Amino acid sequence: MLEFITEKVTCWEKLQQETKPIYIYGMGDGAMKIMSVFKKYGIKTSGIFASDDFVRGHYFEGFKVQKLSEVEEKEKDFAVVLAFAAGYEELVNRIKDIGRKHTLYVPDVPVIGTGLFDYDYCTEHAAELEEVYHLLADDLSKKVFSSILDFKISGDIKHLENITSTKLEIYRNIIKPNLNEHYVDLGAYNGDTIKELLEITRNKYVRIYAMEPDRKNFKKLTKYISEKDHIYAYNNAAWCIDTQLPFSSKSGRQSSLASMGTKYIESKSVDNMLDGKEATLIKMDVEGAEREALWGACQTLSLIHISEPTRRRGIS
């Protein structure tokens, strides 16, 4: 069982044995979760540093936030723990450069909930993981799947190097958008993915529906689409039914539905939003509500007749 998983030791266990000072790169929710796991494992945090643009002499969790250059002046050598997701190439290259100079750990912490992904988790869910692996039709898909599991366990980005595609490659070779898309963007943020899509299609589309629950993000979204036709924005969370749900608003990309949320947000299903209209491409970034969002799109998905010419239709 699980012969496709090669990593057994978690990055947390490696960090327990780390002899160099350990510095967390980044702030926010990711850093808070990592520090919580550090406390559980008895791992000492030596300090916090951030990208230069975010350093303004302030403190985070009792640590003065430093620049990387300041840490490098003070420490002969140290280990770096990445505390955020890198979404653009320049930042990815910066992180890789840090990894060439220092020992780099990229731990996997959950977007929602408190459980950690480790080999014990894999053994507990071995039957499901085996089923997914053997359902994959080609060797590349199997390699991607196994490499991601190894990365999540080990926190070693070497597992991602040979399976990572550029955004342009993904759009051109996998998503393959055409000029007649009925696009649904769930978790539209500030319209960044809509912008990417329109760059590929040269601003050609039929309709775009964008759903974003965070009010600040929604304001940015509506500003971006204000002069564009046939783009409809909804300040809602994607769900299986139309109702009210507790919501934790953190702006940026980390807002999410949460049982302990202090505010309530109106939710909406894709089926009710579209009201029988078609969708050719659906993007979901719904922070743990994927199952409910899919339930709420069942009618819409049932209307998609996948034939050879339209095989590219789907959900990303």
What are these regions (language model features)?
Residues 1-45, 51-303, 307, 311:
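Phosphate/nucleotide-binding beta-alpha loop and adjacent structural elements of enzyme active sites
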